[in-house]
Amino acid sequence: MRVHAAHLLVPVPSTPRRHATLRFTVSAAATSVNVNQADAARKQAVIVGGGLAGLAAATHLASLSVPFTLLEASDRVGGRVATDEVDGYLLDRGFQIFLTAYPECQRLLDFQALRLQPFFPGALVYLGAGESGSPFHMLSDPFRFPIRSLSSVFSPVGTLPDKLLVGITRLRAAATPDDVNLSSPETTTARHLEKLGFSPSIVERFLRPLLAGIFFDTALDTSSRLFELVFKRLVLGDNALPEAGIGAIAAQLADRLPAGSVRLNARAASIDPSSGVTLDTGEAVSGELGVIVAVEQPEAEKLLPQLPARPKSKKPAERSTVCLYFSADRAATNVAPSYAPAGKVLVSVSLVGSFAEREDGELAGEVVRELGGWFGAGEVASWAHLRTYRIGFAQPDQMPPTEPAGRDPRVGDGVYVCGDHVRRRDGVWEEGGRGPGQGWGAVPILELRNLASVREDFH
């Protein structure tokens, strides 16, 4: 087992704890199958799935005054973007970060209201005790913290040419338009880093662990195009966590939707372009203006048999992660004060893979033992295991070759698909709020305007 990232989310004693109340404008449950006549007569679109993709699609439809009903199978919106409160700690369901540089996020979200807590633009790299005596070595962004980054020049994490190459790659990424990046020759990220000229030292000590934690892919088989997209976002913005947890992103989107437009505990069983959506209860929900399927890839393939089949040579890649949370008394870093009660520390540990053969308690014990070698046995002795989250489908298949023309979001007459597994026909991955490569995936705005035009025909 290899721990790829340990994050200490720590309270600042002088900062009072503020609990944000997450309010949703949603129906408490799909309680009634007897839709009143006025609702039955209303022409509407139907969105299947209340994750970020579905919420983003709903937000766009609302902005165009297109009536819709969003159907969410669970008892809450947000999908994988959720936060649980346990004994005063805020536990995101899987360690997630918010990248502020995504244009779609900037258009849809109120950053100030989220009270974002940014990460320092750098990393402490664990190499074990060496000649310097310290097991950790700092790498920081020289363009944001030039003085502090001087120590990075002399760190054993890569060679001096490697560090110069990081700076060159940073400048190039910031200046290159997305359409140029995403139409470039495609290979794996591992091969791409080699072609760029990075040494095995910096790849194995820094880039592979970093990118494996982002893509949940230790082999770095992820598309080089996606690497360029994500690296650019890392360069141009902050990594941050909302004060009330990552679930506050979904809460903010849901709170802006029209009252009664979201139905919870409403699971879609089938989709018929001519009649709309049938729930597992047998209720039919009409979708005269179209149906937008905004669920993760495996579920989308069940609901939409007409989706293009994957190439037989390309098996779905597992993109699983396990996130373990511990409470502690002392801190090594200070990232998100609001995630822990006063005087306590929240430790988040991310593992790449499913570890299905290990029970939660066994896995937590292994993690504590390994990190005892990082921070010292005395430091981790006070850690108490809070909860383990196993995310089986954390990201979709992102290995090359990706679809050269992208997938048309229209998969049938009046039926659209969106989500983090969809790439638009212009070659652009839809951008994300959960983290790199995991995003809104909303239907392109042109298609939504077409729905608005259709709506006018019904009036």
Please provide the spans of the model-predicted regions:
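N-terminal chloroplast transit peptides
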Residues: 1-23
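N-terminal Rossmann-like FAD-binding beta1-loop-alpha1 element of flavoenzymes
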Residues: 37-70
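Glycine-rich FAD pyrophosphate-binding loop
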Residues: 62-86
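C-terminal segments that line or cap access tunnels to active or ligand-binding sites in enzymes
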Residues: 63, 288-290, 295-402, 429
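Helical element adjacent to the flavin cofactor pocket in flavoenzyme catalytic cores
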Residues: 228-290
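Mobile amphipathic helical/loop "lid" adjacent to a hydrophobic cofactor/ligand pocket
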Residues: 102-106, 110-224, 231-236
